[in-house]
Design a protein with these regions (language model features):
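Solvent-exposed interaction surfaces and binding hotspots enriched for charged
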Residues: 2-206
Length: 206
């Protein structure tokens, strides 16, 4: 069977699984006046970035580690960028496919995130990155057995699954009135920043 056919079959399977996760997040972020689009977008894009990091770990890939003055570690490198930026089905590509944001803008966001990691008072789209990381990691653990591992056959599919989820939330946010480019940049920043974090990236009192 051709590789393209295999990829199409995988994507269709992951889209079906993503639908269940999307419905869960729509319920989680529902408010009396509708879905909290910005929070839902930040969270789902962040978990897509987190999925990139977890896929590298699960496949025993290599990180380039940057240690801050206060002893926290942040993670970079080619193996991470493969899922985040480079594969045919990379996470950031799910967002640029919606908005048409160009390569130079994406590159600037990536650079800005690299410069911002670990800095005091830095927020990820208005959210404390330490708190966001804790929420993301708890969610990941909570749905991994019943959803992620059920819908995905191997770790390399995790970023694709959650990229599809976040792309759909992005589209919903735009349909709800969010400016297309601004919403897309929120998604990109959230995914890129969270992909750099692990448990040793978090301030102990953060």
């Amino acid at each position: 069977m051709a590789e393209q056919d295999i990829n199409e079959q995988v994507i269709e399977r992951l889209k079906e699984g993503a639908g269940h996760i999307i419905n869960m997040f729509k319920s989680v972020f529902n408010t009396p006046i509708g879905m909290d689009g910005r929070r839902a977008l930040t969270f789902t894009a962040a978990i897509a970035g987190y999925a990139c990091h977890q896929a590298v770990k699960a496949e025993h890939g290599t990180f380039a580690v940057v240690t801050t003055n206060d002893g926290r570690n942040f993670y970079f490198g080619d193996d991470l960028n493969k899922y985040l930026l480079e594969n045919n089905m990379n996470v950031v590509g799910f967002f640029t496919a919606v908005s048409g944001i160009g390569h130079e803008t994406v590159l600037q966001i990536v650079k800005d995130c690299a410069l911002a990691v670990g800095k005091d008072q830095h927020t990820v789209c208005g959210f404390n990155p330490n708190i966001l990381y804790k929420e993301i990691s708890e969610c990941w653990d909570g749905i991994f057995e019943n959803m992620t591992s059920r819908f995905c056959e191997k770790p390399s599919e995790w970023p694709v699954l959650f990229g599809i989820v976040a792309q759909n939330i992005l589209i919903m946010s735009i349909d709800g009135g969010a400016p297309k480019d601004e919403a897309s940049m929120v998604a990109i920043e959230s995914a890129v920043y969270m992909s750099k974090m692990d448990c040793d990236s978090v301030l102990k009192n953060g």
